[in-house]
Design a protein with these regions (language model features):
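A ligand-binding cleft/hinge motif common to bilobed small-molecule-binding domains
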Residues: 99, 115-123, 173-175, 201-233
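Periplasmic-binding protein-like
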Residues: 53, 133-137, 208, 215-253, ...
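C-terminal region of N-terminal signal peptides and the immediate post-cleavage residues
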Residues: 6-7, 18-37
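Acidic, polar ligand-binding/catalytic clefts
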Residues: 89-154
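Extracytoplasmic small-molecule ligand-binding "clamshell" domains
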Residues: 33-111
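Short helix-initiation/N-cap motifs at beta->coil->alpha
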Residues: 90-102, 183-197
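Bilobed "Venus flytrap"/periplasmic-binding protein-like clamshell domains
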Residues: 49, 68-82, 116, 135-188, ...
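Ligand-binding clefts/hinges and TM-proximal coupling segments of bilobed small-molecule sensing domains
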Residues: 29-37, 89, 169-179, 253-282
Length: 282
């Protein structure tokens, strides 16, 4: 990713990270013996971590989580280190998004794949505390009706067609924050195709996805702007574990230590600093 100067948005991210301590877990408080020799992992003395197939930037760079490059890959290794695992003791596997969140036993110790923490999901899986809560952003292309907007009022005045995926926080944001009627798609892939074909003027997604789409997917793609995620029901993204996992409390304790030490903010700055380059729409 391009290096950018850390501006106010990054400071805001760091501040927000300090509040991401709530979690939906069913395990007891973490004991002091959260070590590779005592943790009841899928494979003894090995931490098996799952991600998507494929995994995309900026979450994982070049679809190689074992490199530790990318926001989620770096977070995973930071948690592993806090638990006492070396990189050699970390094993990566791949899962689909839906299969990992379904009820039942898991072949991984935790899965990191932008899983939003919700009460409904917590009925069938465990979550750690949150490691990230993203702003929303509008992806468009040069010369579109949304190119050059400076405010939410400008977005409304542009009379543009804005898309979002069904049942997403992005769709809620289009309706409730931008105050425009969205064009709804079955998934982000369909919406991206429509944007590429200029069937819509813009697409609302989370900020990291917006940077990837504008840089790698949408011809002449740009980010029209970002706006805060004000959905109080959005608890952020957490590490996903099997329901009643014996290591949920230890994983949460490790993630909380990564956050409180400032390391999570550093990782966020390294891999998501491009947020400083997207104008804030108010």
């Amino acid at each position: 990713m391009k290096k950018t100067t850390l501006l106010a948005p990054v400071a805001a991210i760091a501040l927000a990270l300090t509040s991401l301590t709530g979690s939906f877990t069913s395990a007891s408080a973490a004991s002091t013996a959260c070590t590779p020799s005592t943790l009841k992992t899928v494979t003894a003395k090995t931490l098996t971590i799952a991600t998507g197939a494929p995994a995309y930037s900026p979450w994982v760079i070049d679809d190689k989580p074992e490199s530790g490059k990318g926001f989620e890959a770096a977070v995973a290794y930071a948690v592993a280190k806090k638990l006492g695992y070396t990189n050699a003791q970390v094993k990566w596997i791949r899962t689909t998004f839906d299969s990992a969140i379904a009820p039942g036993p898991k072949k991984f110790d935790f899965n990191i794949q932008q899983y939003s923490i919700t009460a409904d999901r917590a009925k069938v899986v465990d979550f750690s505390s949150a490691y990230y809560k993203s702003n929303q952003a509008i992806v468009t292309y040069k010369g579109s009706k949304l190119d050059g907007v400076k405010s939410i009022a400008d977005v409304k005045a542009a009379n543009a067609t804005i898309g979002a995926a069904v049942s997403s926080t992005s769709l809620d944001a289009v309706q409730n924050q931008l105050g425009v009627k969205p064009q709804v798609f079955n998934d982000n892939a369909a919406a991206v195709t429509a944007l590429k074909n200029k069937q819509i003027d813009g697409l609302v997604v989370d900020l990291p996805t917006a940077f990837y789409l504008s840089a790698a997917e949408v011809p002449n793609g740009i980010i029209a702007g970002q706006f805060a995620n004000v959905d109080k029901a959005d608890k952020g993204a957490g590490l996903l574990l099997a329901k009643n996992s014996p290591i949920t409390a230890c994983v949460t304790k490790a993630l909380d230590a990564v956050r409180s030490s400032g390391e999570l903010a550093t990782i966020t700055s390294k891999w998501l600093t491009a947020s400083a380059g997207a104008p804030v729409l108010k």
